[in-house]
Amino acid sequence: MINKTIPLFLIAGMLWSACQSNSKSIANSDSLEVQPQSETNSPGAGTEQETPLQTKGKIASAAEILARPQVPILCYHQIRNWTSSDGKVGKDYIVPTAEFKSQMKMLADSGFNTILPDQLYNYLAFGAKLPKKPIMLTFDDTKLDQWTVAVPELKKYGFKAVFFIMTVSLGRPNYLSKDQVKQMSDAGHVIGSHTYDHQNVKKYQGEDWVTQIEKPTKTLQDVTGKDIKYFAYPFGLWNKEAIPELKKRGFSSAFILAEKRDENDPLFTIRRIIASGYWNTKTLHNSIVKSF
């Protein structure tokens, strides 16, 4: 059994040291086109079309899913200015406020359209159409600046995002409250699970699945009044044993970081890249092009 209670400062340290980023190898391309096979005209830059999860029909094979062009998915953590106490590794996960705002403006000006997980699932599993230049924005770890900085900036451009919540943090200083999570959900953002306290899924045994997955999922369902269908692995770490555990608990898909997708279960190993605090808008562009 894993230890179920660890201080939040240790959680943060684990995150900074264990998450895997792609920030050191950026392509030099200036291209802005990242287009899966999608023909639906979007209603305008930055907006997504509300699409329910498709549950009927034959789901594509793993090979068919892997053959579809990948949609760029960005993973953010903290949106704030660096401080003297932030280490070199930690800064990779802290995007300065002005830079985040510039990145959102760049995405909007470039005609990117945010999509949500139901749309991505329908595209991967059933070949459903997507808007032009789709992109998904995700935020991990429940930090308060996601509410105070990110949400207003998303609203400015009509963007919607996915917030993966670590429920141990709800209501603590500098973290999101249940009411804020509820308001984000009501505004059209998607709330996903990020475990109870950010423990490594590869170490789960027995009751850990209840403590880290079932109870936090129930908490988020109670907060939002909605089913919780999407999961992000802490540190991006996963193993094959975790996938059936997530499936039997009702998840539709799960998200890793930049490593290769599983050839048998690509819906439960959807790739994301960390938006590094060291990147400007051009390097973010180039990383999107290179990574997807």
Regions found by a protein language model. Give the residues of each.
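Bacterial signal peptide processing site
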Residues: 20-22
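C-terminal motif of bacterial Sec signal peptides marking the signal peptidase cleavage site
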Residues: 15-18
